[in-house]
From Swiss-Prot:
Gene3D superfamilies: Naphthalene 1,2-dioxygenase Alpha Subunit, Chain A, domain 1, Rieske [2Fe-2S] iron-sulphur domain. CDD domains: RHO_alpha_C_AntDO-like, Rieske_RO_Alpha_N. GO terms for biological process: catabolic process. This is p-cumate 2,3-dioxygenase system, large oxygenase component. Component of the p-cumate 2,3-dioxygenase multicomponent enzyme system which catalyzes the incorporation of both atoms of molecular oxygen into p-cumate to form cis-2,3-dihydroxy-2,3-dihydro-p-cumate. The alpha subunit has a catalytic role in the holoenzyme. Also able to catalyze the cis-dihydroxylation of indole-2-carboxylate and indole-3-carboxylate. The gene is cmtAb. Fe cation binds at H211, H216, D365. Its cofactor is [2Fe-2S] cluster; Fe(2+).
Length: 434
């Protein structure tokens, strides 16, 4: 792509921030995004709770690459390319499970859960140290690391250390991990669906507090119309640029949170349990942090495409573009391991009824994003989208657009080929752009 073409325009003097709609429709831009962003950044691949004992595994597609993530016999979690080093066949064709060995169906090579080649038909016709020398082992992903239970991979061996990359987002991953003394865990099941829109529209939407009242009016009306579905909290809060393209909105809201914000519809039994959870949070973390954990909602973006919605349930969501106007979405529910059946019931109900592909919110959002994508057919004559709301403010509200500007500023540093003015925090270098 011609780097002289501006896809992001920032006018600090006139408080204007615009994004070229060409970036949502261009095949050339998409190719650059895979090369310069998805091939260089840290990407979410799983959670440590999915690996409880040696041999536990999941297979995931991350940035078009099929990966096998396993717990080895030494209880270390490893990530490998899910392709046989012999001829390339997929080694593991199951989504998850437990197996000490993985056998390629094509020629029968067998690999241990640590990725090492254990046996092969006709091994006497290979050199003596073919197995022991490692020539036939599964190939590990260049970089793998874990932070606060969240597992990340990078296809760039030179990527900076994960804690440095996460910058200010570390605090929010740590916060989620502290909800439970016994640990947080991914619950059974995965939400999978597709959206006929550009992936960056879902980035914007996921951290957009501006659209809630209008787009999700049906859900808010539903809460109002059922008996005691609302608390007295108002929709209000702030947005924060966390550095390196990461951002968060943190806000109060009228719905209940199993950790640990009660609403009357949950009944007195539920109130007793919620009160106990809250009291334990105070004991462990102090009253100020307990209030933040219990009563504040958070929509967190970790650049480029990990969203953690810590609202009426906790959703971990990733999405990858298949075309400029098409993406695949995967979502998982995260919950305290010790959570009672009662609390888990309400958590999963919230996970489905608001955040699920058949719930109140996601169909609204999908319709909105696909409508935007359809509107981009006019991009040559209506070339710009505006993301200026709240520019120039010392503190941005949750329904301002600082958080989107943080994403787009970082995106432009990768795709535009040169640093741009930052949106409020000191620029922290990550992967070399040369």
């Amino acid at each position: 792509m011609n780097n002289d073409k501006n896809l992001v325009e920032i006018d600090d003097e006139n408080l204007l921030f615009r994004v070229a709609r060409e970036s949502f429709v261009s095949e050339e831009v998409l190719a650059e995004e895979y090369e310069k962003i998805f091939d260089r950044c840290w990407l979410y691949v799983g959670h440590t709770s999915e690996f409880k004992k040696p041999g536990d595994f999941v297979t995931r597609t991350v940035a078009r690459r099929n990966l096998l993530v396993t717990m080895g016999t030494d209880r270390t979690i490893n990530a490998f390319f899910n392709t046989c080093p012999h001829r390339g066949a997929t080694v593991c064709r199951e989504r998850s499970g437990n197996s000490k060995n993985f056998q390629c169906f094509y020629h029968g090579w067998v690999f241990g859960c640590d990725g090492n080649l254990k046996s092969q038909p006709g091994k006497e016709r290979y050199c003596a140290d073919f197995i022991t020398g490692g020539a036939g082992n599964l190939v590990p992903v260049p970089r793998f690391d874990i932070y606060a239970g969240f597992c990340f991979v990078s296809f760039n061996a030179e990527v900076e250390p994960l804690p440095d990359y996460l910058a200010g987002a570390k605090e929010y991953l740590e916060l989620v991990s502290k909800y439970s003394e016994s640990g947080m865990g991914i619950t059974t099941g995965t939400q999978e669906y597709a959206i006929r829109a550009n992936w960056k529209l879902l980035v914007e939407n996921s951290i957009d507090g501006y659209h809630a009242v209008s787009t999700h009016a049906s859900y808010l009306d539903y809460l109002k119309n059922i008996n005691d579905g609302f608390s007295g909290a108002k929709l209000e809060g702030k947005s924060t640029d966390l550095g390196n393209g990461h951002a968060v909105i943190e806000f109060s809201a009228p719905w209940g949170r199993p950790i640990a914000s009660w609403v009357p519809i949950w009944g007195e039994e539920g109130k007793q349990e919620i009160d106990q959870i809250y009291a334990r949070l105070v004991e462990l973390h102090g009253a100020e942090m307990a209030d933040r954990m219990a009563y504040k909602n958070r929509n967190l973006l970790i650049f480029p495409n990990l969203i953690i919605n810590d609202i009426m349930a906790i959703t971990v969501r990733t999405f990858y573009p298949q075309a400029p106007n098409y993406m695949h979405v995967n979502g998982w529910s995260l919950a305290p391991n010790e959570e009672s059946d009662w609390a888990r019931k309400y958590r999963l109900s919230n996970f489905l009824e608001f955040l699920g592909p058949g719930g109140f919110a996601t169909p609204d959002d999908v319709e909105a994003l696909e409508s935007c994508q359809n509107g981009f057919s006019n991009y040559r004559l209506v070339p710009w989208s505006d993301i200026s709301k709240g520019m120039g403010k010392e503190t941005a509200n949750y329904d301002d657009e600082l958080q989107m500007r943080a994403f787009w500023t970082r995106w432009n540093q990768f795709i535009g080929g040169a640093p741009t003015p930052d949106s409020g925090v000191q620029y922290i270098p990550t992967i070399a752009l040369a």
